[in-house]
């Protein structure tokens, strides 16, 4: 085996992964709960970029409902963001699964 070749391949993979990680912020996913009463937009880094709450979801006598709706929407968005990030990183690594990367 040519060690120099392996080193070049490792450098290419490292660069591809770094580029893919930078692009995670450009990935956009959305999720909702309560039939659209709560909507969450998130990027591939699992950072919330927008959260909207329909006034119909705000009932001072039922705070728990709003909390549940927000929790459900955020969890759904996180799942979508992780899936999108995993797909992006998989493309960058040629399908090689690397533990601890994107997700």
UniProtKB/Swiss-Prot annotation:
GO cellular component, one term: bacterial nucleoid
Species this chain originates from: Anaeromyxobacter dehalogenans (strain 2CP-1 / ATCC BAA-258)
Subunit structure: Homodimer.
Main location as per UniProt: cytoplasm
Protein name: Nucleoid-associated protein A2cp1_3777
Annotated compartments: Cytoplasm, Nucleoid
An example molecular function term from Gene Ontology annotations: DNA binding
Function: Binds to DNA and alters its conformation. May be involved in regulation of gene expression, nucleoid organization and DNA protection.
Family: Belongs to the YbaB/EbfC family.
Lineage: Bacteria, Pseudomonadati, Myxococcota, Myxococcia, Myxococcales
Keywords for the protein's UniProt record, in alphabetical order: Cytoplasm, DNA-binding
Pfam families: YbaB_DNA_bd (PF02575)
Cytoplasm as UniProt keyword: yes
Keyword Cytoplasm part of the UniProt annotation: yes
